[in-house]
A protein has these predicted regions:
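Residues at or immediately preceding the N-termini of alpha-helices
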Residues: 3, 21, 205, 237, ...
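Residue-level signal for inorganic ion chemistry
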Residues: 6, 51, 112, 143, ...
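ALDH superfamily catalytic-core signature
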Residues: 138, 172-305, 367, 428-432
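Short glycine-enriched loop/turn motifs at secondary-structure junctions
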Residues: 158, 191-193, 223-225, 258-259, ...
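Conserved C-terminal structural/oligomerization subdomain of aldehyde/semialdehyde dehydrogenase
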Residues: 246, 295-434
Length: 434
C-alpha cells in the first residue's frame, strides 16, 4: 500500500472509530465490566492518540534516512529506505481487547503492510466490534480478522505471514516464537511477568498510594504492566498499606463490589484461580468476593517472598507488600523471578532510579508513577527476556513493521582503479592509515 493510500485509509479508520465510540465502550463493558469512563480512557482514547500520531508523522518516518559513508567509498551517499514486510500477523489478548488489537494494527498499516489479525474469543463483543470497524474500511486482502470461531486460532496460525506480533502469556508466547521459527520470519513478543513497584525514602504517601492503587486496580488488575507486588522499607510498610487502603475506599467506596468503576475478572477460571490464591494466603474474603459478578474487592496485605501470590503473575486486584532494608534487597527479590515487563520506583532521589537502571533488567517503567509509560506514544513499549522481545508504539511501531533496506549511491564520475585487479603495484600504505 503506497504512502498516500495508507494515510487516506487511516483517516477513514479514524472517522469509523469516532462514529463507533459508543459501540466500542459498550462492548468493553460487556466483556470486562469496564465502566464507560475507564473504557474510554484506557482503550478508546489511547487508540485514537496512536492513530492521530501515526497519521501526522508517517510521511516523515517513511522518508529515507541519509547516512554518512567512509572515506574509502568516496564519492558516495548512504541511505536507509523503509519498506513493508508484506503480511503481518497480529495476535491480540483479551485483557485490553480493543487497544491491543488496534494499536499494533495501526502501526503495521502505517508501515504499508497488510494485516491478518486474531482477536480473543474471551472478549466476543469487542472482537465483533473490531472486525466490523476494520471491515468497513479495509478489504479482506488488506486486513483479515479472525477470532469468533473456535477454529480461528488454527486458521490464523496456518496463514501465510511475513512477520508475527503477539501479545499474551509467556506460555503461548513460546508457541508463537516456535511458529515464527518454523516459518523463518521475525517476531515481536509482548508478554508479562511480575512487575514490582518500589517505594523508597521519604514519600508523599497519599499521592504514592493513589498512583499505586490506580495502576493496580485499573481493569481489576488485569494489566500486563500492573504493579504485581510492592517492595517498601520496613518503617514505611504499615503507613503505606494504610494509605493504600484509604485510596481504595476513596476510589471505590466502602463496598468496592458495588462500585460501577471496578471492572470484572474475565471468567470463572481466572476468578477461581485468584480465589484459591487468596485462601492459600489466608486473606479474609468475607464480603470481598462476588462470584456471580466475577468481582473482587481490591486487597493490600503484608507478605514475604514465600507468599502464594509471589509464585506467578497475579493478574487481579491483590497487592502483596514485602519489606526491604535497601535497594540491594530489591535486587534479591526481583531476581527470584524472570525479568519484569515493567518496574516502578517511588523515590525523591534520581540516584535511586539510576541504581535500579544499572542493576535490574526490565522492559520499561515509570519514576513516581505507574502504567503511564504505556500510554506515552513517543516511548517504545516492550519487554526483555521472558517478558518479551521487540517494541512498538508510534515511531517504534513503524520501525518494527518496516524492513530496513540499505542503499549505497555511488558516483560514476570518479572511479578508483586500485579496487580492481591485478594488484601487483598496489601499496595500501599510500591510501590507508591502518
Amino acid at each position: 500500500m503506497d504512502l498516500k493510500n495508507r494515510i487516506s485509509k487511516l483517516k477513514i479508520l479514524k472517522k469509523e472509530l469516532q462514529k463507533s465510540r459508543s459501540e466500542i465502550l459498550k462492548a468493553l463493558e460487556a466483556d470486562l465490566g469496564k465502566s464507560m469512563e475507564e473504557a474510554y480512557l484506557s482503550e478508546y482514547l489511547m487508540t485514537l492518540e496512536e492513530l492521530d500520531y501515526t497519521i501526522a508523522q508517517v510521511p516523515k518516518w517513511a522518508r529515507p534516512d541519509k547516512k554518512p559513508t567512509p572515506y574509502y567509498q568516496f564519492p558516495s551517499k548512504g541511505e536507509i529506505h523503509y519498506r513493508p514486510y508484506g503480511r503481518v500477523a497480529i495476535a491480540a489478548p483479551w485483557n485490553y481487547p480493543f487497544l491491543l488489537a488496534m494499536v499494533p494494527t495501526i502501526g503495521a498499516l502505517g508501515a504499508g503492510n497488510r494485516v491478518v489479525l486474531k482477536t480473543s474469543r474471551k472478549a466476543p463483543a469487542t472482537s465483533q466490534v473490531v472486525q466490523d470497524i476494520l471491515g468497513r474500511v479495509y478489504d479482506p486482502e488488506e486486513v483479515l480478522v479472525y477470532g469468533l470461531d473456535p477454529q480461528d486460532r488454527a486458521r490464523f496460525m496456518a496463514e501465510d505471514m511475513d512477520f508475527l506480533f503477539f501479545t499474551g502469556s509467556t506460555r503461548v508466547g513460546r508457541e508463537m516464537a516456535k511458529l515464527a521459527g518454523e516459518k523463518m520470519i521475525p517476531c515481536v513478543l509482548e508478554l508479562g511477568g511480575k512487575s514490582p513497584v518500589i517505594v523508597f525514602g521519604d514519600q508523599d504517601l497519599e499521592t504514592t498510594a493513589k498512583r499505586i492503587i490506580w495502576g493496580k486496580t485499573l481493569n481489576a488488575g488485569q494489566t500486563c504492566v500492573a504493579p504485581d507486588y510492592c517492595l517498601v522499607q520496613k518503617d514505611l510498610r504499615d503507613p503505606l498499606i494504610q494509605a493504600m487502603n484509604q485510596a481504595i475506599q476513596d476510589f471505590y467506596g466502602p463496598n468496592p463490589l458495588e462500585s460501577p468503576y471496578l471492572a470484572s475478572i474475565i471468567d470463572q477460571d481466572h476468578f477461581r484461580r485468584l480465589e484459591d490464591l487468596a485462601k492459600a494466603q489466608g486473606l479474609d474474603m468475607e464480603g470481598k468476593a462476588w462470584p456471580q459478578g466475577l468481582k473482587f474487592a481490591p486487597q493490600v496485605f503484608p507478605a514475604d517472598p514465600s507468599s502464594p501470590f509471589m509464585e506467578e503473575e497475579i493478574f487481579g486486584p491483590f497487592l502483596p507488600v514485602l519489606t526491604i532494608d535497601d535497594l540491594e534487597d530489591c535486587q534479591k527479590v526481583i531476581n527470584l523471578h524472570p525479568n519484569p515487563l515493567a518496574l516502578y520506583l517511588f523515590s525523591q532521589e534520581e540516584k535511586d532510579l539510576n541504581y535500579i537502571l544499572d542493576t535490574i533488567p526490565f522492559g520499561g517503567g515509570a519514576f513516581n508513577d505507574t502504567l503511564t509509560h504505556l500510554s506515552t506514544v513517543t516511548l517504545p513499549f516492550g519487554g526483555v527476556g521472558q517478558s518479551g522481545m521487540g517494541a512498538y508504539h508510534g515511531k517504534y511501531s513503524f520501525d518494527t513493521f518496516s524492513r530496513k533496506v540499505s542503499i549505497l549511491k555511488k558516483s560514476r564520475k570518479i572511479d578508483l582503479d586500485m579496487r580492481y585487479p591485478p594488484y601487483e603495484n598496489f601499496d595500501p600504505r599510500k591510501f590507508f592509515k591502518k
